[in-house]
Amino acid sequence: MVSFTQLQLAFLGLSALGAAVPVTGTSEKKTFSLNQVKVAGTKTKNPAEHYANALRKYGAEVPSHVLAAAAATGSVTTSPTEFDSEYLTPIDVGGTTMNLDIDTGSSDLWVFSKELPSSETSGHAVYSPSSQSQLLNGYSWSISYGDGSSASGNVYLDYVTVGGVTASSQAVEAAETISSEFQQDPSDGLMGLAFSSINTVQPESQSTFFDNVQSNLASPVFCADLKYEAPGVYDFGFIDSSKHTGSVTYTPVDNSQGFWGFTASGYAVGSGSTVSTSISGIADTGTTLLLLPSSIVKKYYAQVKGSSNSATYGGYVFPCSATLPKFTVVINGYKAVIAAQYLNYSPVETGSSTCFGGIQSDTGIGFSIFGDIFLKSQYVVFDASGPRLGFAPQ
């Protein structure tokens, strides 16, 4: 099982959960799917920023060379077929359809709101509390993310509808202040689907949408079917057998610190033999990269010709023309294979022949992060009844 005793995050001090909220609709148990949408627009990225983001998200100190690389002026202008589009999920928040990021590594539902200056909401859908919305007097929230972005504001109880299932008194965290990073992002906010114990609302944390609607679902599960360079799907209340091959392999979840934590039992690089070793980590749709123990990362890049751990670029890089090996994670006997092309994250800057690796070190975090580089290779079942995680190849 995963141990997170070294994790030092302020929100872990919040232990009291908000009461479960009503779910509208009939007594019939529900199932539904959420299709991500392709949000067009050119987005400029520095690959090292994503690495720094992930380290900071979990309280790790970012090495100086990664900080320097993340702050560098070099950037990547995304292309239509690879990195140019952001995939978001349309969700009805108090009568407004908002495109939100779904993040299994956090537990807040926060959105752009009319409490922000209009100059900061251009291009975004905005949540407007109505006469039926209930302001929670004395309640507030504040979140800081890895890239230095932040948001804070007030808390309302309002209805949130996803796929025909409505939580009629869902805690909606309405942004009153927001940093420029969010203003420039196409997302209208975030829906966290980790466990409610790490919701950041004070003085009393609130339940996630998933926790609030579980009793109205046919099964207390949601499934992530993320895709490589394409929109994915989230299934709620059922497991779609048409989206995976073979059987689903389950492993226990340690949710003691609010995350979907699990332990892998080994790995393999390319066609090499399996190395048996315990890898404790979490499944996080809100992190781009796959972060693993440095010893494993070194062994992977030892098989990539021309690779190096670059102080200039803040992580492992290699010639974009290099042939990468696949990477396999062993979970309860199941071998989850990540295709080689997934592991080339992006060029380090526009026009460069040097690429940034999708696997980087988890140094300083205390556990590994199985982010989108890994998750989009699998159909992943988040099952609250165990709790447990299930994995099957797409």
Curated annotation (Swiss-Prot):
Catalytic activity entry: Hydrolysis of proteins with broad specificity similar to that of pepsin A, preferring hydrophobic residues at P1 and P1', but also cleaving 20-Gly-|-Glu-21 in the B chain of insulin. Clots milk, and activates trypsinogen
Q: What is its main location?
A: secreted
EC number annotated for this UniProt entry: 3.4.23.20
**Propiece span(s):** 21-70
Molecular function in Gene Ontology: aspartic-type endopeptidase activity
Q: Does the keyword ATP-binding apply?
A: no
Q: Does the keyword Signal apply?
A: yes
Where in or outside the cell?
Secreted
- Give a GO cellular-component term: extracellular region
Spell out the disulfide connections.
320-355
Please list the residues that make up the active site.
103, 284
Give the Peptidase A1 domain ranges: 87-392
Renumbered to this chain, the signal peptide range is: 1-20
Look up the record and give one Gene Ontology term from the biological process aspect.
Answer: proteolysis
Instruction: Enumerate the UniProt keywords alphabetically.
Output: Aspartyl protease, Disulfide bond, Hydrolase, Protease, Secreted, Signal, Zymogen
Q: Name one Pfam family in it.
A: Asp
Q: How does it assemble?
A: Monomer.
The UniProt entry's sequence similarity note says: Belongs to the peptidase A1 family.
Function (record text): Secreted aspartic endopeptidase that allows assimilation of proteinaceous substrates. The scissile peptide bond is attacked by a nucleophilic water molecule activated by two aspartic residues in the active site. Shows a broad primary substrate specificity. Favors hydrophobic residues at the P1 and P1' positions, but can also activate trypsinogen and hydrolyze the B chain of insulin between positions 'Gly-20' and 'Glu-21'.
Output this protein's name. Penicillopepsin-3
Gene expressing this chain: pepB
